[in-house]
Amino acid sequence: MAAAKIKRNDEVIVLSGKDKGKKGKVKCVFYNKGRVIVTGINLVKKHQKPIPNKNQPGGIIEKEASVDLSNIAIFNPTLNKADRIGFTIQNGKKIRIFKSNGDIVK
């Protein structure tokens, strides 16, 4: 499998789907499935059963569902648009950079 280009806490933008154009932070990455969970993106309603042991009430809750990696791109704040990620080696360490302007991904 290729190197992980999107990581936790990255600022990403949605490229396609019902939330196209929205931005959010990556909460969780499922590398083996090629999917990510982004805060505030792809909200679905889930019918939750009450769990009395944990004092969790039942009802309909909204939560984030996963999004395919192909439908998101990292957000470049200097250019204010979606960008691609490349890798380079600096001081013996492999770091991620934005392809368009060569800035280091923070």
From Swiss-Prot:
Sections of the chain in a coiled coil: none
Entry GO terms, CC: cytosol; ribonucleoprotein complex; ribosome
Annotated GO biological process: translation
Residues annotated as transmembrane: none
Record text on subunit structure and interactions: Part of the 50S ribosomal subunit.
Family: Belongs to the universal ribosomal protein uL24 family.
Protein name listed in UniProt: Large ribosomal subunit protein uL24
The encoding gene: rplX
